[in-house]
Amino acid sequence: MRVVIQRVSQASVVVENKLISSIKTGYMLLVGISTEDTIADIEKSVRKVSGLRLFPDDSNAQWKRSIKDIGGEVLSISQFTLIARTKKGTRPDFHEAQKGHLALEMYDRFLDLLRQELGEKQVQDGEFGAMMSCSLTNEGPVTIIYDTKE
């Protein structure tokens, strides 16, 4: 499972010219689920996302506070392209990305656990399987790539 964690001052997602979700201070997550991922990977990712200290404290000392500590929001976007293999040729290979219906079940579980950890209203998401337009203001910029297999 791969999760790109971006610290943002705002983020939003639009599908077919309709605003689906938006947040203020927090994280925009891009979440990729592979055929090898299990519930253990989901649980590990939720712990990492909620506990990673990417925010400064009140004295502006960096890397002191987590999303949970600051009461921040999360906008999570499912993105199978994170699982692409690009080792050979010029066309990405998506064979290791989890199949749609299984990926949806796992992604929904990820969102459920994240909402349990951070609060129902703190976690927003896009539209699974849709073509989405995502925008964000990356603060720092701070962008972390987390992979449960590394």
Swiss-Prot record:
It catalyses: glycyl-tRNA(Ala) + H2O = tRNA(Ala) + glycine + H(+); a D-aminoacyl-tRNA + H2O = a tRNA + a D-alpha-amino acid + H(+). Belongs to the DTD family. NCBIfam families: D-aminoacyl-tRNA deacylase. It comes from Eremothecium gossypii (strain ATCC 10895 / CBS 109.51 / FGSC 9923 / NRRL Y-1056) (Yeast). GO terms for cellular component: cytoplasm. GO terms for biological process: D-leucine catabolic process; D-tyrosine catabolic process; tRNA metabolic process. PANTHER family: D-AMINOACYL-TRNA DEACYLASE 1 (PTHR10472:SF5), D-TYROSYL-TRNA TYR DEACYLASE (PTHR10472). InterPro entries: Daa-tRNA_deacyls_DTD (IPR003732), DTD-like_sf (IPR023509). It is an enzyme of class 3 (hydrolase). Its EC number is 3.1.1.96. A Gly-cisPro motif from one monomer fits into the active site of the other monomer to allow specific chiral rejection of L-amino acids. This is D-aminoacyl-tRNA deacylase. Keywords: Cytoplasm, Hydrolase, RNA-binding, tRNA-binding.
